[in-house]
């Protein structure tokens, strides 16, 4: 379904904001920016917005799985335009700190191999946050 003529709420300065302004605004989508996500949810619930565009995990856990979000749902496919949204979430390290990078990579590999990662993730998420295909 087209978003043309719709009002979409977005947190200003985010990658979603950049994407929406580049891809949707030229197609007659009204982009409404906010300082924080609570303001977006308030306007969505009160009918001042048709949709919101944000991080899927945040939307699911901070809104859709709450009482005020129970009448809303995800729509459309995930947006994965690496030109704007990048390639996922990462950890920032000091450039050239190869030892720390190696220790972190080894620790992540170890907990994924021994099942610790899966146990922790299952406690908090209903999907694999590491990005493994289901």
Predicted regions and their residues:
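Proline/Glycine/Serine-rich low-complexity intrinsically disordered segments
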Residues: 1-134
């Amino acid at each position: 379904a087209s978003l043309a003529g719709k009002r979409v709420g977005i947190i200003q300065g985010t990658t979603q904001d950049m994407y929406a302004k580049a891809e949707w605004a030229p197609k007659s989508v009204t982009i409404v920016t906010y300082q924080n996500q609570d303001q977006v949810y308030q306007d969505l619930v009160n009918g001042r917005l048709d949709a919101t565009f944000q991080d899927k995990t945040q939307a699911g856990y901070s809104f859709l799985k709450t009482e005020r979000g129970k009448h809303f749902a995800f729509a459309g496919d995930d947006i994965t335009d690496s030109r704007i949204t990048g390639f996922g979430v990462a950890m920032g390290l000091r450039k050239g700190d190869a030892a720390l990078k190696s220790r972190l990579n080894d620790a992540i590999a170890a907990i994924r191999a021994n099942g610790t990662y899966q146990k922790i993730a299952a406690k908090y998420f209903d999907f694999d946050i590491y990005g493994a295909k289901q």
